[in-house]
Amino acid sequence: MNPVITIVGRPNVGKSTLFNRLTRSRDALVADFSGLTRDRHYGKGRIGERAFICVDTGGFEPVAKTGIVAEMAKQTKQAVAESDIVIFLVDGRLGMAPQDRVIADFLRKTGRPVILAVNKTEGMQSGIVTADFHELGLGEPFPISSAHGDGVKGLIDDALDSLGIAEPDEDELANDPNRPMKIAVVGRPNVGKSTLINKLIGEERVIAFDMPGTTRDAIEVPFERNGKPYILVDTAGLRRRGKVFEAIEKFSVVKTLQAIADCNVVILMLDAQQDISEQDAHIAGFIVEAGRALVVAVNKWDGLDAYVKERARLEIAQKLRFLDFANVHPISAKKGTGLKDLFKDVDAAYAAAMAKLPTPRLTRILQEAIEHQQPKRVGMGRPKLRYAHQGGMNPPIVVIHGTSLSGVTDSYKRYLEGRFRDVFKLRGTPLRIQMNTAKNPYVDADKGKKGKKH
């Protein structure tokens, strides 16, 4: 599971700037759930090959008693409680403030690991600017500039190293055909996740159940269906009650992000009797950005009249149109209707995510697509797409080689994606297109000559 790093500090010390820098990579997952997570932002960050979940909190005043400031303090305390390590950010230009001492005292009492980062140190002598902050008693202050990126990689590397977590090769684990498929059932509260989970698993087929200990402990439920092993990655906050599981914890963004990152296929649950919410769209966005195979289950379908059903279909098509690669299944988790077809699509989505795409066939499809519709000209020339090969699985990545590929428009990439999808029948999985422009050896040679001094 990806570790959780929470950034705390008094207002205007640069927390959001650091957060944005850490989650700026291609797979950044950023959301702001108003109300649910007031002034708390969640993102998936990456430094090199090391992935983590990052939480940006509001300006922290832990002694606030009333109003919005008190609510922000409450949210920050909750964020600290569910984190693996805390980055306490202070302002190196303004120096020590009374609030910093109060926050440091609070963090010490939580028992969470803390790294003290002194921000805005660009152009300053680090030894001088960090000297005052030693009195906080949180170890050696780490000088950084979140605006310029100075020291940020070292800060995160230190944070991850201090946790003593051996980072697995996620792609290698995910692509191991001998491992059972991992499924996550996600969705906002009260859409019927625990009901569906109990129907899918079946009381007699539960093999084991691990109770959670710390924030990092995954709740995984191995089970079998039609003789095939699966692992359910829980986001519903399940607890065993006799022979069934019940959801007794409130919705957790962190658990949802961790489950999505840790699984092979996501079942996104929607409520047919309620409008698509911003929260539904955020969760769907997490899934797409993480590159996970997806099946959409629209629950509580039974008993609806034809008008309401059609309205629900149209709303999903409109508000979640970026999920057009995924199949949508009307179900009743309570009655168990529609689950057979749902699970067929879970298997099909996983197969599509793990599909092997031969280079000769990819290149042939590419050339046929170009013959049918060429990319638009850029200036005097036109991008030249020469050949394609597979660059990864789960999700499938198609790498296209050629020249002047920076001029290929997003609409043309979507056109190519559609061609590859149609031929390889890649339903249920995101498909990534990457452009790889060939280097010009003559240009590189000229640059080398210009750089030499005689």
From Swiss-Prot:
SUPFAM superfamilies: P-loop containing nucleoside triphosphate hydrolases (SSF52540). GTP 2 binds at residues 187-194, 234-238, 299-302. Keywords: GTP-binding, Nucleotide-binding, Repeat, Ribosome biogenesis. Residues 3-167, 181-354 form the EngA-type G domain. GTP 1 binds at residues 9-16, 56-60, 119-122. Residues 355-439 form the KH-like domain. Gene3D superfamilies: 3.30.300.20, P-loop containing nucleotide triphosphate hydrolases (3.40.50.300). The keyword Disulfide bond does not apply. GO terms for molecular function: GTP binding; ribosome binding. It comes from the Bacteria. GO terms for biological process: ribosome biogenesis. Associates with the 50S ribosomal subunit. GTPase that plays an essential role in the late steps of ribosome biogenesis. Belongs to the TRAFAC class TrmE-Era-EngA-EngB-Septin-like GTPase superfamily. EngA (Der) GTPase family. This is GTPase Der. It comes from Polynucleobacter asymbioticus (strain DSM 18221 / CIP 109841 / QLW-P1DMWA-1).
